[in-house]
């Protein structure tokens, strides 16, 4: 694939920077830092452009917080001016990374997403009798900066863009030379791109027809157990040698008819069920919502709004009985 150049000038264009602000501010206009930036928008965008043209981007200003959904994760949110920069970079560079992506990579891509990945997995489960479900141990924390930048250099020949990526990546590490922060736009795209190297190896070297990846969760399907066991050994070696990554121990090598755990669902050839962890998370959130309502913190309208967002996840699976119970209890559309 031909490398792409002359990207940095496009990142610096005033029109691109203004578009980056609009994307960064979408749905966040009520936040103080967004309002402060918007109040002096022309001046702030001019400053950002000057910093980029001087090759002195101001990066590395993060706010850290922890979420539990379901496991504990440290989220690293960039300050708003830096989020504008991230959008400016990805406005121009995302199409370059997109051209490298295979069809069956589903994270951080327009027209893809979690539900499309699950439906594709269901189609493969109907075609192939065996599946191999894998995911990477501490994925974001384990990404090697030097290997990531080397992979980017195979796609991009603009030295200024590569330098800017190196500066952004270098602002965060979990150990020397490793780690991308969870919660940043650039990190999400780069993390998805990093495993694109695995995607091409699976499709072009192993020649696996049934394969789906959503970030660091991926599934291979095949005709028999021995074939997939061989792919497992090869995948371990490839990830270690090429990307410096290791697989989690919870390998799932089983018959497709028994269901594959994928993205919170149990995917069978003919139906979708909620996985046990997703059911537990749903129950905990439901109890929390009921408590807010009973204690008067939420109105019925508040309850309905939160319940709709919660039900959108379970509605995708075969959960008619569960949703009928919700309707009977709360009168919420399911």
PLM segments and residue spans:
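Short, hydrophobic/amphipathic alpha-helical patches that form generic packing surfaces
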Residues: 19, 23, 91, 167, ...
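Right-hand nucleic-acid polymerase module
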Residues: 78, 87, 171, 229-230, ...
């Amino acid at each position: 694939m031909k490398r792409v150049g002359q990207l940095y000038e496009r990142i610096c264009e005033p029109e691109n920077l203004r578009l980056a602000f609009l994307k960064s501010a979408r749905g966040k206009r009520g936040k103080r830092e967004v309002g402060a930036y918007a109040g002096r928008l022309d001046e702030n965008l001019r400053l950002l452009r000057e910093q980029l043209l001087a090759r002195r981007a101001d990066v590395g200003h993060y706010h850290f917080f922890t979420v539990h959904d379901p496991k504990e994760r440290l989220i690293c949110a960039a300050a708003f001016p830096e989020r504008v920069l991230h959008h400016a970079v990805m406005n121009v560079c995302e199409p370059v990374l997109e051209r490298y992506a295979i069809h069956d990579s589903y994270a951080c891509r327009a027209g893809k997403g979690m539900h499309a990945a699950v439906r594709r997995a269901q189609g493969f489960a109907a075609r192939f009798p065996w599946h191999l479900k894998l995911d990477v141990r501490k994925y974001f924390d384990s990404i090697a900066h030097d290997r990531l930048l080397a992979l980017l250099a195979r796609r991009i020949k603009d030295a200024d863009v590569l330098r800017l990526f190196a500066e952004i990546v270098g602002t965060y590490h979990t150990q020397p030379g490793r780690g991308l922060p969870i919660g940043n736009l650039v990190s999400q795209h780069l993390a998805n791109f990093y495993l694109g190297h695995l995607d091409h190896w699976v499709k072009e070297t192993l020649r696996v027809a049934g394969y789906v990846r959503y970030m660091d969760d991926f599934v291979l399907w095949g005709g028999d157990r021995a074939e997939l066991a061989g792919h497992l050994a090869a995948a371990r070696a490839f990830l270690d040698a090429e990307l410096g990554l290791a697989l989690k121990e919870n390998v799932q090598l089983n018959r497709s008819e028994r269901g594959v755990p994928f993205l919170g669902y149990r995917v069978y050839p003919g139906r979708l069920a909620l996985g046990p962890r997703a059911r537990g998370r749903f129950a905990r959130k439901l109890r929390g919502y009921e408590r807010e309502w009973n204690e008067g913190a939420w109105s019925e309208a508040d309850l309905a709004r939160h319940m709709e967002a919660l039900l959108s996840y379970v509605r995708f699976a075969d959960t008619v009985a569960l949703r009928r119970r919700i309707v009977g209890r709360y009168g919420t559309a399911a």
